[in-house]
Curated annotation (Swiss-Prot):
Part of the 30S ribosomal subunit. GO terms for biological process: translation. Residues 581-712 are annotated as: S3-like 2nd part. This is Small ribosomal subunit protein uS3c. It comes from Chlamydomonas reinhardtii. The large insertion sequence is present in the protein as found in ribosomes. Residues 1-118 are annotated as: S3-like 1st part.
Length: 712
């Protein structure tokens, strides 16, 4: 039914090593030691509660005889152990129907000290015996090695004298040749070649083959280069370049044997044609270059002249309109356009009017820019053709540009006005909101101060009640006793299995040293003391530190003005609390003492009967009383399904395995009712496993209860 998981955190049932994966970071978070510790805690708690149940059963038997009312025995549905990443904190949750009666189990705790001492003695004895055995075995092995070494040296000396020893690598045996008639004959005169392994031999063979291949390729390319043939590949095309040495194509005299003859490489006209084409190309290219250079120089001159004319018209006060003056581009025109816009959109809001103005003016600006560019192009062409600029046309261009500039300035002004209006409105809104928020915050502060006062009063009242009420005091003392007992138990367990906790002790030491360094570095902020200056007067430093610590340790319930007494700020107190808590934690880790918290959760009777653990326990009780297994299983199933109308039980599966009804061959039987989807992840399934100890052996009981789908 799904993948099995080992309690230490890795997958089980996989034979291949590469497929097994760890489900937890084993070394980092100390997963193994926590699992081992949790198992120990759970077993101790179960034993405690089982003793309590036995006592309650005896009490019920006695009450039956007397004819008194039968008290209900307390049942534990679940024992949950919670942990953080640090092994310092352990949270234990106990879910049961009667929490008060379960707390009485602590009164029955009896620790046998003799048993612990005997165990320690036996452990020491076994450890000593083991070490002695190891030492003895080591001595024997050393003696054997020495004897073997001496034998080998003796044999070597003998063979060197005779010269007949041949060592074999694999068998490690020494063979000696027998002497024949007083003459020594050496068997191995020739040096035997070292036999290579198959893999090495194949590798060397491949290397030789590749080397030969490279040499052949090199030779082939050298031949091709010597002939003047080279092949190139461009995509799918293969191009062959033929390089031939140039011969003198002009007519020259050649002598065959003795008669001189005039010989030409080819026809003279054919030879001169490509030369002419090359000359034409060169001339065209040069003329283009010259034209480009000339145009760039002219353009530069045009820009210089145009700038000079623009400056002339800008600096000169134009009293009379010169030639080329146009009424279209006058300054009054722009203001008239804006006045018309105002008259049109007076009925609308200021924001909408501003946006409409800006849109219209932007369109106008874009059109004017295009026209100005066209005019500039005409001026440039005239300058290239005639070599000068006409003043009338230049003045028209200047008028257009100035009009454009003023229009752009006007648009920016309108934008600024609209933004200013919007910001003022927003500021007013924000101011009103802030005023409202201030009042709300003040009310909240008052309410919080009242709450804190009421909480402090409640705490004080609770303490007073505890002192007065004897039962409450007894419960509190019982809880403290329980926690101290569990602390001692965990401490013993950790000291016995200290090899699991060496890493945690080392980290705790490192953290403590780091905390000390931090406090020294920030001593000025925390205690108002310079460590370097205080080395001369250590008594003053001690007094100052003790003052601040005593002031910090004052109870806020008694002293409300403890922060302002010696200038201790809230930040300082927060830092001091944090440092103190960390220091305590690291010291506890070094001493291997945990911080244990116990919480009891009461479970309703209806919910208790739905739990898989209670159903499994009831089946175990029935089987141990020698009842027929089929009847027990069916009854449990039917009871659960009858309650399904009221409760949220939607399916049940019960499995029993072992020597059922005392049968010789063990088998497994199961019963199911409703739906029990064991493969779906969303399914909320309550599972429990118990073992029934019968006369015929152990019977395993498994219960699955399906309680609907959970939201992921």
């Amino acid at each position: 039914m799904g993948q099995k998981v080992h309690p230490l955190g890795f997958r089980v049932g996989i034979t291949k090593k590469h497929q097994s994966q760890w489900f937890a970071r084993f070394q980092k978070y100390a997963y193994s030691q926590s699992v081992f510790e949790d198992h120990m805690l759970r077993t101790t708690l179960v034993n405690l509660f089982s003793n309590l149940e036995k006592e309650s059963a005896l009490a019920t038997k006695q009450s039956k005889n007397r004819g008194a009312t039968q008290p209900k025995a307390p049942k534990i549905t679940q024992i949950k152990i919670e942990r953080g990443l640090i092994p310092y904190e352990i949270g234990i949750q106990i879910h049961s129907n009667d929490c008060l009666s379960i707390t009485k189990a602590i009164d029955n705790i009896k620790v046998s000290k003799d048993l612990v001492t005997n165990l320690q003695k036996t452990r020491k004895y076994l450890f000593k015996a083991g070490t002695q055995l190891k030492n003895a075995s080591m001595q024997v092995s050393d003696n054997l090695n020495v004897a073997e070494g001496e034998n080998s040296t003796m044999l070597k000396t003998k063979t060197s004298a005779s010269g007949t020893s041949v060592l074999k690598k694999r068998t490690f045996k020494i063979q000696t040749q027998k002497p024949t008639k007083g003459k020594f004959v050496f068997k191995g005169k020739r040096k035997q070649k070292k036999k290579l392994s198959k893999a090495v031999f194949m590798r060397l063979k491949n290397i030789k083959r590749r080397f030969k291949k490279r040499q052949t390729i090199k030779k082939r390319y050298l031949n091709i280069i010597s002939k003047g043939l080279l092949i190139r590949k461009k995509g799918n095309l293969i191009i062959r370049n033929v390089k031939i040495k140039r011969k003198n194509k002009t007519a020259r005299l050649t002598s065959r044997k003795s008669q001189p003859t005039l010989r030409s490489g080819s026809n003279l006209r054919d030879n001169l044609a490509p030369v002419k084409s090359k000359m034409q190309r060169f001339n065209n290219r040069m003329s283009k270059k010259f034209a480009n250079l000339f145009l760039t120089k002219l353009n530069k001159q045009f820009l210089v002249r145009l700038k000079a004319i623009m400056k002339f018209w800008h600096n000169q006060n134009v009293t009379k309109a010169p030639l080329g003056y146009n009424k279209k581009w006058s300054l009054a025109k722009s203001y008239a356009l804006i006045n018309n816009l105002k008259a049109k959109y007076l009925a609308k809001d200021i924001l909408s009017l501003g946006s409409l103005r800006v849109q219209k003016l932007r369109k106008l600006i874009s059109i004017l820019e295009k026209k100005s560019l066209v005019k500039m192009e005409t001026l440039r062409k005239d300058f290239i053709t005639f070599g000068t600029l006409s003043k009338t046309r230049a003045f028209g261009y200047y008028q257009m540009i100035t009009f454009l500039k003023q229009l752009k300035e006007l648009v920016t002004k309108i934008k600024k006005q609209t933004i200013a209006n919007v910001t003022t409105k927003q500021e007013l809104c924000c101011y009103n909101k802030l005023a409202l928020n201030k009042t709300k915050i003040q009310n909240l502060i008052r309410a919080k101060s009242k709450q804190t006062k009421s909480i402090t009063q409640k705490v004080v009242n609770n303490f007073v009640k505890l002192v007065d009420d004897n039962q409450a005091m007894a419960n509190e003392s019982r809880k403290i006793k329980w926690i101290s007992y569990l602390k001692d138990l965990v401490n013993k367990h950790r000291t016995e299995n200290i090899f699991y906790y060496l890493a945690t002790i080392a980290t705790a030491r490192k953290d403590l040293n780091a905390l000390k360094r931090y406090t020294k570095q920030h001593a000025n902020f925390l205690f108002g003391v310079n460590v370097e200056n205080a080395k001369e007067n250590p008594n003053a430093l001690l007094q100052r530190v003790t003052k601040t610590l005593t002031q910090y340790s004052k109870n806020p319930l008694v002293n409300n003005d403890f922060e302002n007494a010696e200038g201790l700020t809230k930040l300082q107190t927060a830092f001091l609390t944090q440092i103190e808590s960390q220091r305590k934690m690291y010291k506890a880790n070094l001493a291997l003492t945990p911080k244990i918290s116990i919480k009891f959760f009461s479970v309703k009777t209806t919910n208790l009967l739905e739990k898989a653990s209670t159903v499994a326990d009831s089946i175990v009780d029935a089987l141990e009383k020698r009842k027929a297994f089929r009847g027990v299983i069916k009854k449990a199933k039917e009871d659960l399904m009858l309650r399904s109308r009221v409760t949220r039980v939607k399916g049940v599966k019960i499995q029993v395995a072992g020597r059922l009804n005392g049968a010789e061959i063990a088998r497994s039987e199961w019963v199911r009712a409703g739906r029990v989807p064991l493969q779906t992840l969303r399914a909320n399934i309550d599972y429990a496993y118990r073992t029934a100890n019968t006369i015929y052996g152990i019977i395993g009981v498994k219960v699955w209860i399906f309680k609907g789908y959970s939201k992921i």
